[in-house]
């Protein structure tokens, strides 16, 4: 077939889906925070932002990183001996005493629910070996996550260091990562906790979770005299997971609910590419054989049209493949999803064989499909 005379061929399919109008979101959402952001927890797409890259003091939302490192240390069931240094830490506390023996898990709950600064230091000393060692781990993790405008100097966020700062954007990145950890999800979303190794019962300070917002799934509060009110919160509704961050915001509860409600009202998750067979390959070598292993979804508004494209690139089939299927590579191409001329997803295309089986067909879909209702035929570029 002439269509295979080049090394690759590209199938480009355009869909009638809407364009994100960021200006519309900015006009509809007005927050009092100095910095703010709300992102899709699945894709990381920024849905609204205000000075999101401005470096600012962040107060106790610092403790999200402290919790992440404690959880990932694998030491949650270990017993921590509380130091005098931890006990002397000023500010909010869970009232530890010197020499007290507490399970690390209890300290992390006290850190997240009651914002215990003493717990933060006890965690840091146990997990990092010392405060300096733990701070090094915090900054190393921040670098790994791409938090380019963040610098940690302590595990709690107190104003004792000039160069302790982050941004709304970076804290959203951190929280997106943290929410992938089951222990973090559970702790962050706990309303009341009874400590296992202390005579304490703690209620979460996050009023969105405990009182104000039915779709809240967790978060972390913060306040210092210099940072003012800071807040990270998460919410879920109808399969949409959101992350909101505000820094220096006197009306943070209201602003978070305002951002959440706007997104839940105007956005929905669309199925852009369905796992399994790739349409528009009829009459080709790859018909009924080329497939992707996962659904590709994206959060979009109803108004967004014509700005999502799928570029499917496949290897040119060789004559030897027709004679001996074992010579066909496992991965024969890739599917690239473009939105507003930017790549939002790129997944490998597999050729069905004994090692790679197509996903089973699903009879029910949870997402609104735009892939199956594509307008027009395929455009071939050779």
From Swiss-Prot:
Recorded GO MF terms: serine-type D-Ala-D-Ala carboxypeptidase activity
Among InterPro entries, the record links this protein to: Beta-lactam/transpept-like, Peptidase_S11, Peptidase_S11_C, Peptidase_S11_N
Q: In which pathway does it act?
A: Cell wall biogenesis; peptidoglycan biosynthesis
Q: Which UniProt keywords apply?
A: Carboxypeptidase, Cell shape, Cell wall biogenesis/degradation, Hydrolase, Membrane, Peptidoglycan synthesis, Protease, Signal, Sporulation
Q: Where in the cell is it found?
A: Forespore outer membrane
User: In what way does this protein cross or attach to the membrane?
Assistant: Peripheral membrane protein
Residues that hold substrate according to the record: 220
Q: Give yes or no: UniProt keyword Transmembrane.
A: no
What does this chain do? Removes C-terminal D-alanyl residues from sugar-peptide cell wall precursors. Required specifically for the synthesis of the spore form of peptidoglycan (cortex).
Q: Could you say which protein family the record assigns here?
A: Belongs to the peptidase S11 family.
What is the protein's name according to its record? D-alanyl-D-alanine carboxypeptidase DacB
Task: Identify the species of origin.
Answer: Bacillus subtilis (strain 168)
């Amino acid at each position: 077939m002439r269509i295979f005379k080049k090394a690759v061929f590209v199938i480009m399919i355009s869909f009638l889906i809407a364009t994100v109008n960021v200006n519309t979101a900015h006009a509809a959402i007005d927050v009092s925070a100095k910095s703010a952001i709300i992102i899709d927890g699945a894709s990381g797409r920024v849905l609204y932002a205000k000075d999101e890259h401005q470096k600012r003091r962040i107060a106790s939302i610092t403790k999200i990183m402290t919790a992440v490192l404690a959880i990932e240390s694998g030491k949650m069931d270990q017993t921590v001996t509380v130091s005098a240094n931890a006990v002397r830490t000023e500010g909010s506390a869970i009232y530890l005493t010197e020499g007290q023996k507490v399970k690390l898990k209890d300290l992390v709950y006290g850190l997240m629910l009651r914002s215990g600064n003493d717990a933060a230091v006890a965690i840091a000393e146990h997990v990092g070996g010392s405060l300096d060692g733990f701070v090094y781990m915090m900054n190393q993790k921040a670098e790994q996550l791409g938090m380019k405008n963040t610098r940690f100097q302590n595990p709690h966020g107190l104003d004792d260091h000039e160069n302790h700062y982050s941004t709304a954007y970076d804290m959203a990145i951190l929280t997106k990562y943290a929410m992938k950890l089951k222990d973090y999800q559970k702790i962050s979303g706990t309303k009341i906790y009874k400590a296992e190794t202390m005579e304490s019962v703690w209620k979460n300070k996050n009023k969105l979770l405990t009182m104000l917002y039915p779709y809240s799934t967790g978060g972390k509060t913060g306040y210092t005299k210099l940072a003012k009110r800071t807040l990270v919160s998460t919410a879920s509704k109808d399969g949409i997971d959101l992350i909101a961050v505000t820094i220096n915001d006197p009306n943070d509860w209201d602003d978070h609910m305002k951002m959440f409600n706007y997104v839940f009202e105007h956005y929905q998750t669309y199925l852009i590419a369905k796992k399994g067979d790739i349409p528009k390959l009829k009459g080709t070598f790859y018909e009924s054989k080329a497939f992707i292993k996962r659904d590709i979804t994206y959060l979009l508004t109803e108004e967004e049209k014509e700005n999502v494209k799928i570029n499917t690139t496949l290897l040119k089939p060789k004559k030897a493949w027709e004679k001996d299927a074992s010579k066909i590579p496992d991965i024969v191409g890739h599917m690239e999803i473009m939105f507003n001329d930017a790549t939002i997803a790129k997944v490998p295309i597999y050729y069905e064989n004994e090692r790679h089986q197509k996903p089973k067909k699903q009879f029910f879909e949870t997402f609104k499909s735009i892939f199956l209702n594509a307008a027009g035929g395929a455009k071939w570029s050779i």
